[in-house]
């Protein structure tokens, strides 16, 4: 998974903490989370890293984006297996029902804390302040 962050790690360990949060939410080893730190050309504004504020604000955005990504993965997996979305589950690498569908069978996606975005598929955008999610086509690129 790729985790693109808008927060700046100034020795506070936020890159590591956000990767830990994403790994926990996605039920995957932390080694499967690749962190891309802030890029001022594409990242939204961040007011800075103060005390533990980044963990609470960006951490919540990471959790919400991961939960939304899991829902999207389950929905796509259910469609591919032609079963009801509520009858499938996701274990961090596979969507399963009576049969198992590996992510590599149909998913090309990008999981990110503040914003997920990639070339094809779907994207989950998350505003860390308001938690509003814009309605748009989503993108993902998942690889291990």
Where do the model's predicted regions map?
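Cofactor-centric catalytic regions
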Residues: 1-2, 6-26, 38-144
